[in-house]
Amino acid sequence: MPKFFAEITDTFGGEANYCWVHRFIIEASSMRGAVWKLTRETGYSFRMDYNTGDFRRYNVPRAAICMFIEWADDNIVDQYLNAKRI
């Protein structure tokens, strides 16, 4: 099953701030499925901001929070050992 890497962080002035960050490795059949699993895990409602194909940014409405998600290869999975697995 494909894996996805996601980061949820705060924003300042609309840009990612990384004052705090939560990282996730998600197993899902599609990127949309990965976002759905992350929505259930965190309780946030995400709205897509932009999509470059393999990389997407989502914002949480009425909150200074954003999420980045991308396809994860084995190098990324090995690099972030402290990322929560979903």
Predicted segments with their positions:
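Hydrophobic beta-strand residues in large extracellular and virion-surface proteins
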Residues: 4-6, 26, 34, 38, ...
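A short, charged, amphipathic alpha-helix used as a generic interaction element across diverse proteins
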Residues: 29-53
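Short aromatic-glycine-(Arg/Gly/Cys) micro-motifs in beta-strand/loop hairpins
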Residues: 1-21
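Generic structural motif
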Residues: 9-11, 29-31, 63, 72-74
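A short, exposed loop/beta-hairpin motif centered on an aromatic-Gly-Thr core
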Residues: 17-32
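Short, mixed-charge low-complexity intrinsically disordered segments
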Residues: 44-86
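Short intrinsically disordered coil segments
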Residues: 21-24, 39-43, 84-85
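Intrinsic-disorder-associated interaction segments
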Residues: 1, 27-31, 58
